[in-house]
């Protein structure tokens, strides 16, 4: 008897985004990222629950959940072009969702969204009208707070908590059906030169500590060519989480240069 795993891609769905633009991530200028659904939107969260219920009803052993988070400015359909050099800070601010539901999520915590919207918009206007002042600087929460103010950190915390609640609701469905809940973690792709992927997960709205308490298994995308880089990332997850871990490697170019290279990474 075969054990069947369902690989579900949740928030990266252009067909739904184009048919329902109100469900798409919407930045501070009102630009819609139609390839990306906003997980804060209750209708989108409901869709994620419905998709999960449908899959667990089919006698599967596990759900491998991909794209259950935000993605960033460059993910898109992989055809997007900016034609100017943008820092990681600018890309991050440009991709932040301020759809009505993200605004409500922030204001439900007792905060006024207007100052935050103004600061983000003004900061990005400097880039587009003059030059990106953050080129060469690493994206950190500390730098964001310096640029925008502490409100940005509150915003990020609120969205992490809301996304964690979506995971909790999905987990209730999988547990009731006796289905394993696996999370495809794209954090290693945020900074291809970093061995500490977990420290970058906040950039896509994921609080690893919260998710660690909900899911059954992390499946990080460890797309690296060097054997040591693979080992370092695996160590990062082994030390930073206590859920199960199944690394996803890419057996083709450019990650694997030879059969021996792949064998060494697996072993």
What are these regions (language model features)?
Residues 1, 31-46, 150-162, 218-224, ...:
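The substrate-binding groove and active-site-proximal loops of carbohydrate-active enzymes
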Residues 71-118, 247:
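Short acidic, glycine/proline-enriched helix-loop-strand junctions
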């Amino acid at each position: 008897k075969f054990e069947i795993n369902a690989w579900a891609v949740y928030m990266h769905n252009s067909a739904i985004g184009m048919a329902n633009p109100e469900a798409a991530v919407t930045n501070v200028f009102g630009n819609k990222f139609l390839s990306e659904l906003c997980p804060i939107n209750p209708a989108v969260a409901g869709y994620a629950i419905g998709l999960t219920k449908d899959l667990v009803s089919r006698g599967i052993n596990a759900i491998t959940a991909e794209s259950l988070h935000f993605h960033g400015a460059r993910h898109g359909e992989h055809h997007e072009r900016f034609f100017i050099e943008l820092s990681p800070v600018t890309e991050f601010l440009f991709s932040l969702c301020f759809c009505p539901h993200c605004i409500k999520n922030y204001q439900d915590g007792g905060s006024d969204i207007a100052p935050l919207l103004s600061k983000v918009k003004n900061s990005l206007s400097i880039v587009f009208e003059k030059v990106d002042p953050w080129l060469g600087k690493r994206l950190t929460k500390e730098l964001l707070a310096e640029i925008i103010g502490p409100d940005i950190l509150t915003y990020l915390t609120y969205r992490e908590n809301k996304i964690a609640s979506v995971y909790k609701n999905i987990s209730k469905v999988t547990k009731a059906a006796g289905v394993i809940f696996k999370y495809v973690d794209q954090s290693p792709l945020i900074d291809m030169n970093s061995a500490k992927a977990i420290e970058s997960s906040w950039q896509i709205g994921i609080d690893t500590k919260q998710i660690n308490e909900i899911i059954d298994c992390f499946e990080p995308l460890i797309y690296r060519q060097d054997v040591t880089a693979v080992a370092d990332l695996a160590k990062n997850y082994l030390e930073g989480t206590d859920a199960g871990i199944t690394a996803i490697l890419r057996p083709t170019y450019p990650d694997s240069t030879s059969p021996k290279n792949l064998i060494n990474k697996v072993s």
